[in-house]
Amino acid sequence: MALSELALLRRLQESRHSRKLILFIVFLALLLDNMLLTVVVPIIPSYLYSIEHEKDALEIQTAKPGLTASAPGSFQNIFSYYDNSTMVTGNSTDHLQGALVHEATTQHMATNSSSASSDCPSEDKDLLNENVQVGLLFASKATVQLLTNPFIGLLTNRIGYPIPMFTGFCIMFISTVMFAFSRTYAFLLIARSLQGIGSSCSSVAGMGMLASVYTDDEERGNAMGIALGGLAMGVLVGPPFGSVLYEFVGKTAPFLVLAALVLLDGAIQLFVLQPSRVQPESQKGTPLTTLLRDPYILIAAGSICFANMGIAMLEPALPIWMMETMCSHKWQLGVAFLPASVSYLIGTNVFGILAHKMGRWLCALLGMIIVGMSILCIPLAKNIYGLIAPNFGVGFAIGMVDSSMMPIMGYLVDLRHVSVYGSVYAIADVAFCMGYAIGPSAGGAIAKAIGFPWLMTIIGIIDILFAPLCFFLRSPPAKEEKMAILMDHNCPIKTKMYTQNSSQSHPIGEDEESESD
């Protein structure tokens, strides 16, 4: 008995060092983070609209005095404008009673027109104003994450990846519970902003951890494709999961289910990563400012930013546009994103492997062009079925870009800098967050000012124009001191070139400064 227990403990101890288990932890963290990111997409526009108009209807009802009839003997009829009902307490003529009931019914229709046609709102001005409000709420998470990322990158270099990873779980759990019980815009904004800090911890630490345990370029690309599949699954499940539970159970339900799943993730992290131990990197990483001056890293980061900015602009603006032009039901507001989510999942898994063979630069270039063209087609849709093809194209192409550029970030650090990954994946996450910070906030304002179709035209053209810059990532040159290290056969870090040795380098303003020790 003791021997079997000892063998089990030894097996569990060995599993803690398993690369596949670490990959699963990162996959699960990204899955839940992005479920929380997208579960609010169909809920918030409709929820804010409903609480705003409930408030307006209540103000109208409480401000209206009770009707008094001028004819004698009409005091036997009592009218309630709280629930718009008529109660007869005495004798009165049928004609007078019918007239007063008709008047009360007319008042009911006037004060509650929004509830009678909740799926097809007529208050165009209110919907336009909500573009800005919803856009700022969605952008707050990415903005906070954007500001937090550089600090998390430096922190992982000093104390390792497990503690920031577990901290991200704790913050995300608090944010999820806050979403469940928030009843005002202010508390929703705080919950969304708090999620940004947790996401920063999970994303930077998770990707850095994968890059450190998967040192081979091809294996790293495959692993990051799988991890991004978790992100894709979260984006896939979030909107329909949120919209269906919101319509048939209520606002609180999806967030409570999500909170339970987050607790499960925390338990696994606690067992495997042992976040109480500080595990600093064995060598000092390249300064963040040096990485930001590397033009190849900036091109890769720009691809991530502009590709994701397209879907980020869609998140607040598309549900409102659908409510305004298609009279869409609540559940349709989330299901509309389903094609993009499914295709993103397909794209990240297919091109996580294929991009290494065809060239990651080419994969990203084609992805940027497809993103732009698909976004340009979205305003042409007349109903929810017309959104299927362009949304599918958007998701698939963003999957191509993300699964190509994430491994390239680690590859560029191996090739041109010190192989410590916290800071470079902080830059990658900053790029991702810039797309999700600028996208909803600017997108909401642009949609209000010049309309949803012009918003899609602008971001579509930007993506297409940025695409040719990916050509410079075809064969980035190594720094001289790094080339000497990589040529050493005894070097413990293996990196496989993803282009042919005969391909020509394309230097673009390379920084000749040597790395600081």
Swiss-Prot record:
Coiled coil: none annotated. It catalyses: serotonin(in) + 2 H(+)(out) = serotonin(out) + 2 H(+)(in); dopamine(in) + 2 H(+)(out) = dopamine(out) + 2 H(+)(in); histamine(in) + 2 H(+)(out) = histamine(out) + 2 H(+)(in). One of its GO terms (cellular component) is dendrite. It is found in: Cytoplasmic vesicle, Secretory vesicle, Synaptic vesicle membrane; Cytoplasmic vesicle, Secretory vesicle membrane; Cell projection, Axon; Cell projection, Dendrite. Serotonin binds at residues 231, 235, 308, 311, 315, 337, 344, 402, 436. It is a multi-pass membrane protein. CDD domains: MFS_SLC18A1_2_VAT1_2. Belongs to the major facilitator superfamily. Vesicular transporter family. This is Synaptic vesicular amine transporter. It comes from Bos taurus (Bovine). The gene is SLC18A2.
